[in-house]
């Protein structure tokens, strides 16, 4: 009985480790994540960044963004692996469509769209956003707001 319990535990452990490693590999080649930031009454940067599974990214800076206009960049495979694995672990498709409180004013929103190759999910994050989603937003904003490696489309 003890050996059977140990075998069941080992099988479950192996299956859970294996499923987390498959995250990005299970996504269709057309998968992408997009971050859009919305304006506020102050100087909140507004932009849209889209990153494809293969690392190709586009950025469109509008108001108060360090980069104004259209930019492109290719992120490393390691960066993409970490990012898309995190998104898969977050189970975006099961999340609510909005985190907000309409009584709270003048907060910009971070709108995340994830497309896995078949289905897409857009989540508007403005108020009372769970910590794991805030971590994803922080990671996406760091990638978007960096100035290194982005090339203006007009310079291509």
Regions found by a protein language model. Name each.
Residues 46-48, 68-70, 120-122:
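Short, mixed charged/polar active-site loops
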Residues 58-95:
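A short-motif feature that recognizes glycine-rich, charge-decorated loops
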Residues 1-15:
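Sec-dependent bacterial lipoprotein signal peptides
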Residues 51-55, 74-82, 114-120:
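A short, structured loop/turn motif at beta-sheet edges
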Residues 5, 17-41, 73, 86, ...:
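Short, well-ordered, aromatic-rich surface patches in folded extracellular/luminal domains
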Residues 37-65:
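Post-signal-peptide N-terminal segment of Sec-exported extracytoplasmic proteins
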